[in-house]
Curated annotation (Swiss-Prot):
Native species: Burkholderia cenocepacia (strain ATCC BAA-245 / DSM 16553 / LMG 16656 / NCTC 13227 / J2315 / CF5610)
CDD domains linked to this entry: Radical_SAM
Pfam families the UniProt entry points to: BATS (PF06968), Radical_SAM (PF04055)
Molecular function terms, GO-annotated: 2 iron, 2 sulfur cluster binding; 4 iron, 4 sulfur cluster binding; biotin synthase activity; iron ion binding
NCBIfam families: bioB
Keyword Protein biosynthesis on entry: no
Gene that specifies this protein: bioB
Enzyme's top EC category: transferase
Known function: Catalyzes the conversion of dethiobiotin (DTB) to biotin by the insertion of a sulfur atom into dethiobiotin via a radical-based mechanism.
Protein name: Biotin synthase
């Protein structure tokens, strides 16, 4: 088993290029963040065009298959049982309801269907329904992704045997900032689950949330962690905090949109073959800022009116923006010639 390791923070001055072999110290990533904006965007677009069609964006739809009542205390999350957000816990959806939602997602142009459950980890009694969902969605011709919390080795193997394409398990933030957001799950717990997913042969979807009050260096620490996973994730969702009433982070000041765009660009440069996804919080960006995100190297986004328990730009707005920018929806496996 390849054991993911926490990357140490280093403060020495560094060159602009990534040290061989593909190793990004936090100081390297900070240096990218601090480039003049136009230089950073130019470099990110160059890297993007080396590996991807710059005018193709993959569309994913996310469905909450089990909402609320989560044992974890993630400070950003409305689904935590530790927070009073007015969200009621629900049981796991039945398979037919999930497949109906997947059919609707495909009809709306999505090529990947992601299923999220709010719990610390799935129980064995859940696995038959979960694997049936995976098989059913794949039969519709969609890529499959699940985010179910921590996994045991056997659970990862069961999902792999069912044909799961991607498993999402975010690092959320840097190791240094992590303790200010979450106390019920360790950073190493997250890394261990990523190892189990890799060992089972499932592609990794792993990113984080920015705008939680972290510093730029701590944002760089998240990107460093992601880029130094061996290998780095095939799919990297970047979330812009949605400050939900009733959560500990409800009063957090919004992140400067240009800092969000910078984060997309830095993710593209440090993980050149990854699919970089605009995820939660996209509604907070106007059309011009979303266009900048695509220029910075984002080539996937969550598509649909709801992301778990937060709103998302309406599909008609997305289609209109694509038309204005000359962007087309693309199948995930057709995005890159080199991925």
């Amino acid at each position: 088993m390849t054991q993911a390791q926490t990357v140490a923070v280093q403060s020495d001055a560094i060159p602009m290029a990534a040290p061989a072999p593909q190793r990004w110290r936090v100081a390297d990533v900070v240096a990218l963040f601090e480039l003049p904006f136009n230089d950073l965007m130019f470099r990110a677009q160059q890297v993007h065009r080396e590996h991807f069609d710059a005018n193709a964006v993959q569309l994913s739809t996310l469905l909450s298959i089990k909402t609320g009542g989560c044992e974890e205390d993630c400070g950003y999350c409305s689904q935590s049982s530790h927070h009073d957000t007015g969200l009621k816990a629900e049981k796991l959806m039945d398979v037919d309801t999930v497949l109906d939602a997947a059919r609707a997602a495909k009809a709306n142009g999505a090529s990947r269907f992601c299923m999220g459950a709010a719990w610390r980890n799935p129980k064995e009694r859940h696995m038959p329904a979960l694997t049936e969902m995976v098989r059913g969605v794949k039969e519709l011709g969609l890529e499959t992704c699940m985010t179910l919390g921590m996994l045991e080795d056997e659970q990862a193997r069961q999902l792999a045997d069912a044909g799961l394409d991607y498993y999402n398990h975010n690092l959320d933030t840097s190791p240094e900032f992590y303790g200010q957001v979450i106390s019920t799950r360790t950073y190493q717990d997250r890394l261990d689950t990523l190892d189990r997913v890799r060992d089972a042969g499932i592609n990794v979807c792993c990113g984080g949330i920015i705008g939680m009050g972290e510093s730029r260096r701590e944002r760089a620490g998240l990107i460093s962690q992601l880029a130094n996973l061996n290998p780095y994730p095939e799919s990297v969702p970047i979330n812009n905090l949605v400050a939900i009433e009733g959560t500990p982070l409800e009063g957090t000041a919004p992140l400067d949109p240009f800092e969000f765009v910078r984060t997309i660009a830095v993710a593209r440069i440090t993980m050149p073959k990854a699919v970089v996804r605009l995820s939660a919080g996209r509604e907070q960006l106007d059309d011009a800022m979303q266009a900048m995100c695509f220029l910075a190297g984002a080539n996937s986004m969550f598509y649909g009116d709801q992301l778990l328990t937060t709103s998302n730009p309406q599909t008609q707005r997305d289609r209109a923006l694509f038309e204005r920018l000359g962007i087309r929806a693309s199948q995930a496996d057709a995005l890159s010639d080199n991925a």
